[in-house]
Amino acid sequence: MTVPKSSYFTTASYFSGTLFEIRHAVTKHFNLEENNHNLQLENMRLRSQVPSYLYEIGRDSIIHVDSNYHQQYQYIPATIINSTITKRNNFFTLNAGRIHGIRKGLGVFSSNGVVGIIHACSEHFSLVKSVLTSDINIDVMIEGNGAFGLLKWDGKNPNNGQISGITNDIKIPINSNVVTRGGSGIFPRGLTVGKVTKVTPVEGKSVWRIEIQFSEKYAVLENTYIIKNLFLNEMTALQTKNEGY
């Protein structure tokens, strides 16, 4: 039996087209990874120029912005390569370590919100204690009225957190934005944390129990930034020296 030449042509065209589709998909995947990395670098560059993340020197001068500010924060992009969200204390593993200038105690955030604090480092990797842990205690505040407290997580829903320490004489509107306060120096002031969803009084105490919805979906998070406060040692040394006053 003789197979028509047209059949050979059709079969060859099919396999050729399939190979091109596979090659295109693979190329697209790697291009997407490269584009994501480039976007991270661009976001990092832009954040480093935001005036609220800089330390103002010439506060009464408006002659030249660059001479009036010193960069206070540096940002190092990193990708999550392993994570947990269902345990009582959850961690993220990042593909950046000591060779990138990472050390214990640095803050980690994403384009959507706060992620956690570096807990341990090796040469090439870092372990992040995420906001989904029992003792995270990040200082946060309510936008609009400036009320501040500590971010907590009760171990139940990875999408929701709690704020403690705000007295119930302060009105806390539902849907208020929650942001970092910046008091510890780990995070700059004003990074997104989430929104207030519920406010209830704590029985026998003069404080609120405040429920928030996190702005970041930690179950699908991949790209992060590690933040380094260039003035942190100066700030903590001053505070430690004057603790008794």
Over which residues does each language-model region extend?
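Extracytoplasmic/periplasmic terminal helices and flexible tails
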Residues: 1-99, 103-245
